[in-house]
Each structure stands twice: as structure tokens, then as C-alpha cells.
Regions:
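Short loop/turn segments that connect beta-strands within beta-propeller blades
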Residues: 34-37, 77-79, 119-122
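A conserved positional marker within WD40/Gbeta-like beta-propeller blades
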Residues: 27-30, 48, 70-71, 90, ...
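WD40-repeat beta-propellers
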Residues: 29-33, 72-75, 114-117, 138, ...
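A structural motif specific to WD40 beta-propellers
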Residues: 39-42, 81-84, 123-126
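WD40/WD-repeat beta-propeller blade N-cap
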Residues: 5-6, 44-51, 86-93, 128-135
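Conserved strand-to-loop turn within each blade of WD40 beta-propeller repeats
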Residues: 23-26, 65-69, 107-111, 149-153
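Short coil/turn segments that connect the beta-strands within blades of beta-propeller domains
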Residues: 16-18, 59-61, 101-103, 143-145
Length: 161
């Protein structure tokens, strides 16, 4: 497993170096390149509510952010340029998780749903109701076949692809 992880890392390693994004309750995010010093390389703005979660795609090309403003934003993972807005949740979005192949992501929300999004088409693929309360956590299985979600309803659900 460790060998596979190292191979994947070497395959996608960016010649520009690793990047870090910090999200904040002042509605902004900053992109940094730690090896280049302490000055941020991009300021990412546009959310109208507190930013709850940010996640780079496994291939490093994209970044998504989830917010209390009920939206998900897609950004260029190298430059920080805004690319697309995803709307569909009716309450705050708490967390997002990428599929291993970077083609899809899933979002978890206060509205008790999960939503599966297609990156290429940039639209909602599936709405996954099933929890009785806010969904706080979501993640993909390493093989991409399942999604796990945890909710305030005290249920852990496993969704099959």
C-alpha cells in the first residue's frame, strides 16, 4: 500500500512544489507555496459565508471549497483562479470529498443530504437523501466504489457507486 501511495504521489507531484490553502471565517482563502516563503501566491474570494472545508483534487489540478453560504466553489489548484459555482444544497455545506480519479466529488450538508457532482459536466449527478439530520462527514473509499457519511442522526451510512 505504501509503495502504491508513493507511486501515485510521484506521478502527480507538481514541479512548482506543494501548495497549501487556508480557509477563514473572514470569507477568504489564501494559497501558499511553503517552500517559496511566507507570502501567499493567491487570494481566493467569493464566498458569502464562512468557509468550512477546502480540498485539493487527488491530481492536484483543482480545489473545492464548501461554505455556510450553501455553495461549493471550484478553483484552479495551481493558480487559485475561480472556475465554477455549484449550487444545490439548501443549507450550509460542511464537507466535500474527491473521488480517487478526480472526476467527481461528494458534498455533505446541514440539509441532511449528500450530493454527488460531476466535474467534467460541472453539474449535479445524484442527490443522496437518507440521513435524518445534518451530515457532518463524508469520504470515498480508496477503490472509489463506496462513499461513507456520518450524521448528527448518529448513523454512519455506506453508499455504493
Amino acid at each position: 500500500m505504501q509503495k502504491y501511495a508513493i507511486e501515485r504521489y510521484e506521478k502527480i507531484k507538481d514541479p512548482l512544489g506543494e501548495r497549501l490553502v487556508s480557509g477563514s471565517d473572514d470569507l477568504t482563502m489564501f494559497m501558499w507555496q511553503p517552500k517559496q516563503g511566507t507570502k501567499q501566491i493567491a487570494r481566493l474570494t467569493g464566498h458569502q459565508g464562512i468557509i468550512n472545508h477546502v480540498a485539493f483534487s487527488p491530481d492536484g489540478f483543482y480545489l473545492i471549497s464548501a461554505s455556510f453560504d450553501k455553495s461549493i466553489k471550484l478553483w484552479d489548484g495551481r493558480s487559485g483562479k475561480f472556475l465554477c459555482l455549484f449550487r444545490g444544497h439548501v443549507q450550509s455545506v460542511y464537507q466535500v470529498a474527491w473521488s480517487a480519479d478526480s472526476r467527481m466529488f461528494v458534498s455533505a450538508s446541514k440539509d441532511s443530504t449528500l450530493k454527488l457532482w460531476d466535474l467534467e459536466k460541472r453539474k449535479l449527478m445524484f442527490d443522496l437523501p437518507g440521513h435524518a439530520d445534518e451530515v457532518y462527514a463524508v469520504d470515498w473509499s480508496p477503490d472509489g466504489e463506496k462513499v461513507a457519511s456520518g450524521s448528527k442522526d448518529r448513523m454512519l451510512r455506506i453508499w455504493r457507486n
